[in-house]
Amino acid sequence: MSRSAWKPPFCHPSVLRLVNRALKQGSINKVIKIHSRASVILPNCLGLKFAVYNGKDYIPVSVNDQNMIGHKFGEFSPTRKFAGHNGDKKAVRR
């Protein structure tokens, strides 16, 4: 079920504070480390660089596309590593 239309988009207060501080200081190239994967990317985040925590490492996310606005930070920071499918053992044996 989607979020109610009357509610504003969720963005953690600490993320908003860090974004506003970066915009006020003019430090656009500085990476902002965040843990809140559920926060929505807002229009004022455009042009900033983030490091989103996936449970082990910080994954760099650069918000430089208009299409990223409205998505969540967690969508761009995968938490699982794909190990690949096992090949056919008969084909390897030949």
From Swiss-Prot:
* NCBIfam families per UniProt: rpsS_bact (TIGR01050)
| UniProt-listed GO biological process terms | ribosomal small subunit assembly; translation
Report the sequence similarity comment from the record.
Answer: Belongs to the universal ribosomal protein uS19 family.
Gene name? rpsS
Q: Which organism is it from?
A: Wolbachia sp. subsp. Brugia malayi (strain TRS)
Superkingdom per UniProt: Bacteria
For this protein, the record's SUPFAM superfamilies field holds: Ribosomal protein S19
**HAMAP family of this UniProt entry?**
Ribosomal_uS19
Q: What is this protein called?
A: Small ribosomal subunit protein uS19
- Any Pfam family the entry gives: Ribosomal_S19
Q: Which UniProt keywords apply?
A: Ribonucleoprotein, Ribosomal protein, RNA-binding, rRNA-binding
Which PANTHER family does its entry note? RIBOSOMAL PROTEIN S19P FAMILY MEMBER, SMALL RIBOSOMAL SUBUNIT PROTEIN US19M
Could you give a GO molecular-function term held by this entry? Answer: structural constituent of ribosome
- One GO cellular component term noted in the UniProt record for this chain: small ribosomal subunit
- Gene3D superfamilies on file: 30s Ribosomal Protein S19, Chain A
Tell me, what does this protein do in biology? Protein S19 forms a complex with S13 that binds strongly to the 16S ribosomal RNA.
Q: Output the InterPro entries linked to this UniProt entry.
A: Ribosomal_uS19, Ribosomal_uS19_bac-type, Ribosomal_uS19_SF
